Amino acid sequence: MSHRYIPLTEKDKQEMLETIGANSIEELFGDVPKEILLDRELDIPNGEDETTLLKRLSRIAKKNITKEDYTSFLGAGVYDHYTPAVVDAMISRSEFYTAYTPYQPEISQGELQAIFEFQTLICELTGMDVANSSMYDGITAFAEACILAFSQTKKNKIVVSKGLHYQALQVLHTYSKIRNDYEIVEVDLDGTVTDLEKLEDAIDDETAAVAVQYPNFYGSIEDLEKIKSLIKNKKTLFIVYTNPLSLGLLTPPGDFGADIVVGDTQPFGIPAQFGGPHCGFFATTKKLMRKVPGRLVGQTEDDHGNRGFVLTLQAREQHIRRDKATSNICSNQALNALASSIAMSALGKQGLQDIAVQNFENANYAKNQFKDAGIEVLPGTSFNEFVIKLDKPVKEVNDKLLEEGIIGGFDLSEVNEEFGQAMLIAVTELRTKDEIDTFVKKVGEING
C-alpha cells in the first residue's frame, strides 16, 4: 500500500527500475557528475505521523493574530465582513472547486452559468453594460483599465487622483513602464477628497483617462458628477475604482457616465487573509466591450433551442491572438467569483442595501464618538472608513491596542507623510456599539 503522502514504495521503485533496465537510483542518474551530487542525507527532521503533525501545525497557527480572536478596525482595502454560511458549503462542491475558467463549455455549463451570473450581478451593481469573468484583484483590474484607455484613445497621459489606493498607484506606475511615453499625472487632495481645481488643470486634450476611487482610499466619497463634468473631451475616458458593497447605498458609477468601473469583490464572501487571493472585477460599456481583458461568458442557444453558455469574443485573448491580445491575463479567480456570487445572492438586493447602511451608520457613529472624545476627525463624507489625527505615533497606539485585544486602523504615515500621525479606521457591519465605544475609549487613553 502506498504511503498517503509519498506515492512510491520501495517495491514500486524497484519495479520501475527493472522496467527501464536500471539496477538502482544511482545508476539511473549516473550521467550526473559526482561532484554536484549530495553525498549525505538532507539536514531536515524525520517525517511525523498525522497526529503529531497536526499538533505541530496547530501550535504554529496559534501564533497568528486573527480577527476571530480580536476586534478589528483595520481596512485599507481588505475588510472584516459577514460571510453567509452557504458560501463555503457551495464552493466546496467538487464540480466548482477550481480557479480556472473552463475551456470546454459543452461539459462545463454549471461553472459557466455561475460566471455568467457573477458578470450579471456586477453589471447591476455598477450600472454598466458588460463585466468580465473576474480578475486577480481590484488593483490589477484598475491597472488593466488604464492600459485599455491608452489603447482605445491612442493617447499617452492618464490623470489619477491621489485618493486612489496607494498600491493601485504603485501597480499603475509599474504597468506604465511597458512604454517610455506613458505619462501618469497624480492630482493632490483637498483634505481627503480630490482637489477639483487641480484636477481640471491637469486634464487636457491629450488625456486618455481620468481615474478616481469611490469611496476613496481615505474613506471619503468623491463627487463623481462634478468630476465627470470636468472631462470635456469625449475621447477622454472616466475610470472609477469602487468598493462594490458601497454601491448598495451609493449611486452606481455608471449613472454618472463612467466608462470603466473596477474593484474587488473581497467584501462579498472572501476572507481577509494575508495578501489574498481576492477577486477583481472589470465592468464597462458596450462600446469598449471588445477591449475588455480576461474572459467573457456569453449566453447562447444550442441547435435544439436550449439556453447555453460559452466563452465569447475570444479573439481579444492571448490564446487566440497573442500579439494583438487586449491583455496577458491567462486565468482568473473563478472560485472566488463564485463565492462572491453566492454571497450576493444569499444577501439579496435588500440584504445588500441593509449591510451597506449598517456600514455607513456604524462608521459615522464612530466618527461622532471620536469627535466627542476630543480626537480630530478629518472632514469628508464617509461610507465605512475615515481618518483620525493622533498626537502619538500610530504604531505605538496600535501596539498598545493589540495588548487590549483590538486591531487598530491603518498607519497612514507609512504611505503618506502629508497626513502626519493619522490612522485610517474601518467600521463594518460586524462592529457593535460596545466595541466601537471601547475602541474610542482605548484610543483616547493611549493617545493621552
UniProtKB/Swiss-Prot annotation:
EC nos: 1.4.4.2
Enzyme class name: oxidoreductase
SUPFAM superfamilies recorded: PLP-dependent transferases
Gene3D superfamilies: Aspartate Aminotransferase, domain 1, Type I PLP-dependent aspartate aminotransferase-like (Major domain)
Pfam families: GDC-P
Top-level taxonomic group: Bacteria
InterPro entries named in the record: GcvPA, GDC-P_N, GDC_P, PyrdxlP-dep_Trfase, PyrdxlP-dep_Trfase_major, PyrdxlP-dep_Trfase_small
Keyword Oxidoreductase (UniProt): yes
Example of a GO biological process term: nucleoside metabolic process
Keywords for this protein: Oxidoreductase
Reaction catalyzed: N(6)-[(R)-lipoyl]-L-lysyl-[glycine-cleavage complex H protein] + glycine + H(+) = N(6)-[(R)-S(8)-aminomethyldihydrolipoyl]-L-lysyl-[glycine-cleavage complex H protein] + CO2
One Gene Ontology MF term: glycine dehydrogenase (decarboxylating) activity
Role noted for this protein: The glycine cleavage system catalyzes the degradation of glycine. The P protein binds the alpha-amino group of glycine through its pyridoxal phosphate cofactor; CO(2) is released and the remaining methylamine moiety is then transferred to the lipoamide cofactor of the H protein.
Annotated family: Belongs to the GcvP family. N-terminal subunit subfamily.
Record's subunit section: The glycine cleavage system is composed of four proteins: P, T, L and H. In this organism, the P 'protein' is a heterodimer of two subunits.
The protein's name: Probable glycine dehydrogenase (decarboxylating) subunit 1
Species this chain originates from: Staphylococcus carnosus (strain TM300)
Gene name, Swiss-Prot/TrEMBL: gcvPA
